[in-house]
């Protein structure tokens, strides 16, 4: 997708050198937004291969409210291994905050709440889910990089709720390794929520705070920028699933994905 390559190019052209938590060093810009029209295909980067099983599986893991890598391992997904403790636990990360945000009266299921709000009060401006729980950050293996997202319902010409869009605010984006993953994950989430609320996916808006390229990814970025984006693939989800908790990997189908070869790079932990 050219819009993603434009972000990489902007970081190389305008970014500043900054030290970071991992000790690797980055080139970074602050404040960037990309808008993906989901009617034009699924926004999956084609200028390198993205392993979609990991993307789709991680999102379903979040939606399960899970914070242990056991389920991921059962599905041959190992993207969280570097942060898990000896028991496979990660602390109160995304799934916990999405499905079990602590409250004086118990816990709050933000995902169930937002799905119900979209169904019953589509014009609300409060269709928001947050993973940034300040009180629990110190207990998390990794504080949330993608921190808050909001849904927005658009009517058709007759005023009927028809289209669903999602905007993500991401405080920190590893633009070479992580951001393509995040784009695909939240585009998929938009498809899933649209499906169970009787809407159609319209747009995914990705707003980044610190968008950076690690210094040990620069060679891969230069190689990726030589590649011309190919057509977006098509995503379909099982329309028979009416509950956000009901989706399995087998309910998600991607067709027409024709990427360039992968560009391996080390992850900064």
From Swiss-Prot:
CDD domains assigned to the protein according to its UniProt record, in alphabetical order: TS_Pyrimidine_HMase (cd00351)
InterPro entries referenced in this protein's UniProt entry, alphabetically: Thymidate_synth/dCMP_Mease, Thymidate_synth/dCMP_Mease_dom, Thymidate_synth/dCMP_Mease_sf, Thymidylate_synthase, Thymidylate_synthase_AS
Keywords: Cytoplasm, Methyltransferase, Nucleotide biosynthesis, Transferase
Main location: cytoplasm
Keyword Methyltransferase assigned: yes
Keyword Cytoplasm: yes
Known EC number: 2.1.1.45
Enzymatic reactions: dUMP + (6R)-5,10-methylene-5,6,7,8-tetrahydrofolate = 7,8-dihydrofolate + dTMP
Record-level GO BP terms: dTMP biosynthetic process; dTTP biosynthetic process; methylation
GO MF term set: thymidylate synthase activity
Assigned GO CC terms: cytosol
Pathway stated in the Swiss-Prot or TrEMBL entry: Pyrimidine metabolism; dTTP biosynthesis
One Pfam family per UniProt: Thymidylat_synt
Family stated for the protein in its record: Belongs to the thymidylate synthase family. Bacterial-type ThyA subfamily.
NCBIfam families: PRK01827.1-3, thym_sym
HAMAP family, alphabetized: Thymidy_synth_bact
Protein name: Thymidylate synthase
Designated gene of the protein: thyA
């Amino acid at each position: 997708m050219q819009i993603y390559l434009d972000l990489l190019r902007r970081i190389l052209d305008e970014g500043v050198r900054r030290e970071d938590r991992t000790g690797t060093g980055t080139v970074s810009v602050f404040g960037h937004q990309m808008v993906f029209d989901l009617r034009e295909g699924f926004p999956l980067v084609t200028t390198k291969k993205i392993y979609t099983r990991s993307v789709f599986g991680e999102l379903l893991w979040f939606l399960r409210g899970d914070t242990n890598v056991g389920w991921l391992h059962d599905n041959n997904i190992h993207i969280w291994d570097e942060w898990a403790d000896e028991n496979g636990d990660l602390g109160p990360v995304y799934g916990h905050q999405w499905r079990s945000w602590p409250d004086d009266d118990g816990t709050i299921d933000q995902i169930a709440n937002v799905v119900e709000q979209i169904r019953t009060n589509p014009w609300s401006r409060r269709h928001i889910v947050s993973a940034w729980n300040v009180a629990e950050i110190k207990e998390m293996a990794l504080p949330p990089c993608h921190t808050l997202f909001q849904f927005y319902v658009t009517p058709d010409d007759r005023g009927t709720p028809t289209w669903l869009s999602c905007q993500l605010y991401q405080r920190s984006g590893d633009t070479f390794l992580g951001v393509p993953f995040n784009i695909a994950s939240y585009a998929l989430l938009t498809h899933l929520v649209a499906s169970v609320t009787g809407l159609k996916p319209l747009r995914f808006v990705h707003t980044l705070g610190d968008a950076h390229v690690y210094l040990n990814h620069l060679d891969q970025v230069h190689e990726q920028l030589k590649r011309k984006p190919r057509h977006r693939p098509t995503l379909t989800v099982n329309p028979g699933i009416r509950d956000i908790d009901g989706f399995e990997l087998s309910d998600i189908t991607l067709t027409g994905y024709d990427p360039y070869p992968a560009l391996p790079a080390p992850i900064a932990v």
